[in-house]
Swiss-Prot record:
GO CC terms, sorted: chromatin; nucleoplasm; nucleus
Alphabetical list of InterPro entries matching this protein: Ets_dom, ETS_fam, TF_Elf_N, WH-like_DNA-bd_sf, WH_DNA-bd_sf
Gene: ELF1
Assigned protein family: Belongs to the ETS family.
Any GO molecular function: DNA-binding transcription factor activity
Name of protein: ETS-related transcription factor Elf-1
Organism of derivation: Homo sapiens (Human)
């Protein structure tokens, strides 16, 4: 008797020749070994259930075709009972032999109705789809001692390997998103066309809040002075100049064309509770940011250009301190000239020429704007010139030494600018005849903080000159001017160089490249004569005046008629080099050579610009 069930049902196969009563069926000694397995081709076995196998081949059951084959012979009184236990076959060539062996087992009668019911249920509930399911083959063996042995073998079916679509997972369906509505066109007359860029906030999306929107408007040139502006920038107080326009901009950003100030005001009141904004009491449409973010772009009302300022108080107060220092550094003209003291700033230290009259001095890095004289009938131009101010000489009323600041709007566009030249403080200059030893003249530059303003250059003051003091030096020199004639006014007086306006311009302007770029090594000797030659550059024909110690060279405002362009220098004099008891010897006019030493770091990258128009925003 043989019965076949599908998948997880047990299959009992046994053979017997003598089964007469139920006692023998219930006795476990009659069935020494039982195999329980899953048959892969159950539908084929069911179709062959009614066929009879007449002859069996001799090699139907062999060790080569079966994985496990056990044979047990039990001696009985009547016949010998032979029980064959098979395992599943794994070779494709022996499948037919396995089917024939199964047919022989199916032809036997069933000893009981229980297995027949399982067979009927299997035929009813089985389907072709169930046949496709691959289940592991389980071998259960029961020995005579009652010890069960279980072995499970995985079986792969070719149908599943051939179908790639079964293993591939199903593709997820696309979710239908909500279509965004196109924005409604706004009238350019009622709603300004202002676009606010959205900022990504660490993956939180592109949502921009109302307070961020207001900050963006405050940093936009098209909206800041017109629709919204700062009233107290340091405290974060701003005012909605045109509340309707701001609300329309917010509605355009939120795609709500019916937005008004009342609706936007409710959102602003929500920020009161959050501690972001506050309403300034007593002022309409004025609000305050509780915390100001850093690196805001502030729009200046007077200047259309914007400047990035930090909210750090130390940095934001730098501009205010500079303005205060500039206002404190105003020098009165009348007491300074009558007292005989002229304020001159040095780059190294901030000391006046005479400490008897203390004056508050600004930093050398500041550039002060020069007030135009009211008596000037034409625009005044600033040139790089030098002017000698006598300490004991009274200045007429026409001249006034003043330094002040003025607004950018009041500056005339024709006013020339004064550029600070990054040069060393000591510029040695050598004046010596060709056949004599060289002597150096040290000049010191003057910062552009004190400007002597003259209304009429032809007023009765001394001529404009350079005073160069000779000191010894043994350093490399740069040729400044050759064939300079020294003329002596009288016997015993220091020789002076007298040049016309064209010669002064040629010396001090055409030789700028020579001073900045080229250096010529000239042998010099530390020894020099007792008479220190004083070089005087006279722009126009006027009487030369002897200058006692303490003479100061500063800059002066020249008119358009004057063509002399020079550097602003300050003469550094030493009383040890000026001897009153000079030898009374007549000196013949002979050519001199003027050279400039580059020993004190006189860089070749000095850029000297002249006649540059002063822009209102240059300061």
């Amino acid at each position: 008797m043989a019965a076949v069930v599908q998948q997880n049902d047990l299959v009992f196969e046994f053979a017997s020749n003598v089964m007469e009563d139920e006692r023998q069926l219930g006795d476990p000694a009659i069935f020494p070994a039982v195999i329980v397995e899953h048959v892969p081709g159950a539908d084929i076995l069911n179709s062959y259930a009614g066929l009879a196998c007449v002859e069996e081949p001799n090699d139907m059951i062999t060790e080569s075709s079966l994985d496990v084959a056990e044979e047990e012979i039990i001696d009985d009184d009547d016949d010998d009972i032979t029980l064959t236990v098979e395992a599943s076959c794994h070779d494709g060539d022996e499948t037919i032999e396995t089917i024939e062996a199964a047919e022989a087992l199916l032809n036997m009668d069933s000893p009981g109705p229980m297995l027949d019911e399982k067979r009927i249920n299997n035929n009813i509930f089985s389907s072709p789809e169930d046949d496709m399911v691959v289940a592991p083959v389980t071998h259960v063996s029961v020995t005579l001692d009652g010890i069960p042995e279980v072995m499970e073998t995985q079986q792969v079916q070719e149908k599943y390997a051939d179908s790639p679509g079964a293993s591939s997972p199903e593709q997820p369906k696309r979710k239908k998103g909500r279509k965004t509505k196109p924005p409604r066109p706004d009238s350019p007359a009622t709603t300004p066309n202002i676009s606010v860029k959205k900022k990504n906030k660490d993956g939180k999306g592109n949502t921009i809040y109302l307070w961020e929107f207001l900050l963006a408007l405050l940093q936009d040139k098209a909206t800041c002075p017109k629709y919204i502006k700062w009233t107290q920038r340091e405290k974060g107080i701003f005012k909605l100049v045109d509340s309707k326009a701001v609300s329309r901009l917010w509605g355009k950003h939120k795609n709500k064309p019916d937005m008004n100030y009342e609706t936007m005001g409710r959102a602003l009141r929500y920020y009161y509770q959050r501690g972001i904004l506050a309403k300034v009491e007593g002022q309409r449409l004025v609000y305050q940011f509780k915390e100001m973010p850093k690196d805001l772009i502030y729009i200046n009302d007077e200047d259309p250009s914007s400047s990035i300022e930090s909210s750090d108080p130390s940095l934001s107060s730098s501009a205010t301190s500079n303005r205060n220092q500039t206002s404190r550094s105003r020098v009165s003209s009348s007491p300074g000239v009558k007292g005989g003291a002229t304020t001159v700033l040095k780059p190294g230290n901030s000391k006046a020429a005479k400490p008897k009259d203390p004056v508050e001095v600004a930093q050398p890095s500041e550039v002060l704007r020069t007030v135009q004289p009211t008596q000037s009938p034409y625009p005044t131009q600033l040139f790089r010139t030098v002017h000698v101010v006598q300490p004991v000489q009274a200045v007429p009323e026409g001249e006034a030494a003043r330094t002040s600041t003025m607004q950018d709007e009041t500056l005339n566009s024709s006013v020339q600018s004064i550029r600070t030249i990054q040069a060393p403080t000591q510029v040695p200059v050598v004046v010596s005849p060709r056949n004599q030893q060289l002597h150096t003249v040290t000049l010191q530059t003057v910062p552009l903080t004190t400007v002597i303003a003259s209304t009429d250059p032809s007023a009765g003051t001394g001529s404009q000159k350079f005073i160069l003091q000779a000191i010894p030096s043994s350093q490399p020199m740069t040729v400044l001017k050759e064939n300079v004639m020294l003329q002596s006014q009288k016997a015993g007086s220091p020789p002076s160089i007298v040049l016309g306006p064209a010669q002064v311009q040629q010396v001090l302007t055409s030789n700028v490249q020579t001073i900045c770029n080229g250096t010529v090594s000239v042998a010099s000797s530390p020894s020099f004569s007792a008479t220190a030659p004083v070089v005087t550059f006279s722009p126009r024909s006027s009487q030369l005046v002897a200058h006692p110690p303490g003479t100061v060279i500063t800059s002066v405002i020249k008119t358009q008629e004057t063509k002399t362009l020079t550097q602003e220098v300050e003469k550094k004099e030493s009383e040890d080099h000026l001897k009153e008891n000079t030898e009374k010897t007549e000196q013949q006019p002979q050519p001199y050579v003027m050279v400039v030493s580059s020993s004190n770091g006189f860089t070749s990258q000095v850029a000297m610009k002249q006649n540059e128009l002063l822009e209102p925003n240059s300061f």
